[in-house]
Regions:
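N-terminal, positively charged/glycine-rich alpha-helical extensions of SAM-dependent methyltransferases
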Residues: 1-40, 46-50
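Conserved alpha-helix/loop element of class I SAM-dependent methyltransferases that forms part
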Residues: 43-66
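Class I SAM-dependent methyltransferase SAM/SAH-binding core
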Residues: 65-104, 128
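A conserved beta-strand element that flanks and buttresses the S-adenosyl-L-methionine
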Residues: 115
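A short glycine-rich, Lys/Arg-flanked "PGG" loop and its adjoining helix->strand segment in the class I
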Residues: 127-139
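Conserved class I S-adenosyl-L-methionine
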Residues: 143-178
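Short alpha-helix
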Residues: 189-214
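Conserved Class I S-adenosyl-L-methionine
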Residues: 215-265
Length: 268
């Protein structure tokens, strides 16, 4: 894989060089990249929109109104939906509260929705997260998670190109056993491992939760934008055409998609 290693080095976003991926400076650099690169902003804005649309469509009967985004970091949720409480595990000037998915700082049944954009695979204890969903989210509410997909293109790229974090569909465990390990020590295939490979086991352990949707999406638009870790590959002016092409290729999303949106509702 020497060629891929050289390609990663060539395409790497230079503003991240030398930064600790678990430090606040890294998050601040990511935020600056999102603000600077319009194509990345459009991708992240689409992720936020997907969270909100799933919430409004599938949690409509929930009596609670409060919504929280986990791992808000460099994201756009606060700008697009200012009523959503933003949070992170690091003290950052642009989030509302410090919060971990395993320890939500809210009363029982007080939340309508929990959003997480590429956050779930960083959790140290996924079972604690689902227990917290069952406790803090009111019946009829739930969570919307956007995570790395598990189709052929995603497996290829996350295993061989986007390698800053592991991607292991055969991982024996759902969690890292030491909560003090860095969040970057993650398994990007975790949503597949827990909800697909071990889906029957997950449902048995959490009978009050129901997986409502698992929708693959996003490939070309993310790749050409470079995301937050790589250089942009096309002029910004090409973005509209790229998005049109991506929509035309939607029937191939199960094969090409790099992300998927997961919706889980608390039934009781």
């Amino acid at each position: 894989m020497g060629v891929l290693s050289a390609l990663r080095d060539l395409l790497a976003e230079p503003s991240l060089a030398g930064l600790d991926p678990d430090g606040p400076e890294f998050t601040a650099a990511h935020r600056a990249i999102v603000e600077r690169k319009e194509l990345v902003r459009l991708v992240f804005a689409d992720f936020c929109r997907r969270c909100r649309e799933a919430d409004e469509r599938l949690f409509a009967d929930c009596a609670a109104r409060a919504r929280i985004e986990l791992g808000s970091g460099a994201g756009l949720m606060r700008q697009l939906y200012p009523e959503v409480i933003t949070s992170d595990v690091k003290p950052l000037p642009f989030v509302d509260v410090l919060a971990r998915g395993e320890e939500l700082p809210f009363r029982d049944g007080s939340l309508r929705a929990v959003y997480g954009i590429n956050v779930f695979h960083h959790l140290a204890d996924t079972e604690a997260f689902f227990h917290e969903l069952t406790r803090a989210v009111a019946p009829g509410g739930g969570c919307v998670l956007i995570e790395p997909h598990y189709g052929p293109a995603a497996r290829l790229l996350f295993r061989h190109l986007f390698t800053s974090e592991d991607y292991d569909v055969h991982a024996p465990s759902w969690q890292r056993h030491d909560r003090d390990r860095p969040a970057s020590d993650a398994n990007q295939a975790l949503s597949y491992v827990v909800l697909r490979r071990d889906g029957a086991r997950w449902q048995e352990r959490f009978p009050g939760l129901r997986l409502l949707a698992d929708t693959p999406h996003t490939h070309l638009s993310y790749l050409v934008s470079g995301g937050v870790n790589f250089r942009q590959l096309v002029p910004t002016s090409a973005g509209r055409g790229i998005r049109r092409l991506e929509r035309a290729l939607a029937p191939l999303d199960p094969i090409l998609a790099l992300q998927h949106t997961i919706v889980i509702r608390r039934e009781r």
